[in-house]
């Protein structure tokens, strides 16, 4: 059977890729090993967090689905880093895992131009030169032809789980690994490796003594992840906090030899910023305790997730260490924690469009690229899907820059630097994070989604109204001046005869203070919050914009693909090797490759500025 596009895998990357391509009117097939596990939250029952929440809102602004699914399935909402500046604040929501999964599958099933099929892809159909995709072959011998394929294997490509001495070829507990494509990819010359991740035990709610824990409530004022949603009124469940102690650490230390992580059996690098409890005890010996979050997995389940207690120790040891923790003395394990090791492709093998350099029409996204996390996977899946569709239309790829989005930072880091460990997004990875606030995701990206055809007229009109209203209120603030009769607050005295716009730049004055004086300035919380943040941080934002303009000149110089950098005189040997391997898309990307000197960039700039050599403007966003 023939399709325009095939998506391999039904995880968070696969969902976004399949929806994007089919919504752009291409006949799409998603093939996954188990249709009942589409959109499964394999590890923590939460979406969002620092930088991750920003990415979810960016996905939504571009026309992706993750924001709408979590808005539907959330059971608790919190804004993280509330006490800090807006650049590092981020929304995070606990999810009802089953509800999230069900909604994801339902969305796919109802989507026009999209078919779902349960099978395991074991090989590619390629042209005679073996450098262009023509389809896939499945475990049961089915052949499906297509012009593009998006590969999203998650932890399933030669996945292997570890619990003490127990080993099994699985990508998740009780779910079999995928084999076949690993040999195909190696045969095509892809640079591959092994990575490791892990998950903690789940326990029964009734076995927890919550009186010995700290309660963590959600925020009463919920900010929707999706810009298409208005005010959300949700029932919320509490999370709870407890801590490991000296006895917990002793149990782990006494049994460290039983951990496959330290016995040498696991060769893949684990996530640096989400270590197992064994790793924490070894690497942070000075710490007397580690924080553990007890998180509900849904409204209709008694299972609780022990965030911060990931482990691959034997089950009896896991039981002992859990029972040593206050509040968990009688905790009953329903599912053990485990480590999982899996194959990944070094993302340096990809163009910024996420298309493979070795095989035309093959796009790769998610954990297959060495990233970690649902949000990172979904972001890549969306961009891979968009660019696969643009390839089918014979159009230039859509490349988001580092200055436009966290998604741009994520992909640029992966394809420019590669990775040897699971890559996780942080606000600190973005040079211009004040410009990437979660509340401005629509301002930065929704027009792109609209122009592509992924954002409908209704959503775009709603955004234009918001944009117009923000500007109107700013103008009103510039026109309104503070008079003596307005002053009811001592803090305002020093601002007499100043306009409200400049008064609002004072950190001690809030927009609420000014609305009390002039109620006509009042509007929805979303609009007022954006007005206030835009004005208060205007100076910083303008300085960042000046820097971005200077960097933009480097982004504009597009470098040719498959170029022989050995012919350019003046480049260092290291630069020639790295440019040839990475094949940077722009001069800016070339400058970010580790080990590249400014002199190498100057040589490139002079070479491609020569009229004899081709210089193309890159319409990155």
UniProtKB/Swiss-Prot annotation:
Q: Which Gene Ontology molecular function entries are recorded, alphabetically?
A: flavin adenine dinucleotide binding
One Pfam family from the record: SAM_GIDA_C
Free-text function comment from the UniProt entry: NAD-binding protein involved in the addition of a carboxymethylaminomethyl (cmnm) group at the wobble position (U34) of certain tRNAs, forming tRNA-cmnm(5)s(2)U34.
Q: Which GO terms describe its cellular component?
A: cytosol
> Record-annotated residues binding FAD?
9-14
Q: Supply the PANTHER family for this chain.
A: GLUCOSE INHIBITED DIVISION PROTEIN A (PTHR11806), PROTEIN MTO1 HOMOLOG, MITOCHONDRIAL (PTHR11806:SF0)
Required co-factor?
Answer: FAD
Major place of residence: cytoplasm
Tell me which family the UniProt entry assigns to this protein. Answer: Belongs to the MnmG family.
Q: How does it assemble?
A: Homodimer. Heterotetramer of two MnmE and two MnmG subunits.
The organism of origin for this protein: Borreliella afzelii (strain PKo) (Borrelia afzelii)
* One record GO biological process: tRNA methylation
Q: What is the recorded name of this protein?
A: tRNA uridine 5-carboxymethylaminomethyl modification enzyme MnmG
Sequence positions that bind NAD(+): 270-284
Per the record, the domain of life is: Bacteria
Q: Which UniProt keywords apply?
A: Cytoplasm, FAD, Flavoprotein, NAD, tRNA processing
The places in or outside the cell where this protein is found are: Cytoplasm
Q: Where is the signal peptide?
A: none
Q: Which InterPro entries match?
A: FAD/NAD-bd_sf, GIDA_C_N, MnmG, MnmG-rel, MnmG-rel_CS, MnmG_C, MnmG_C_subdom, MnmG_C_subdom_sf
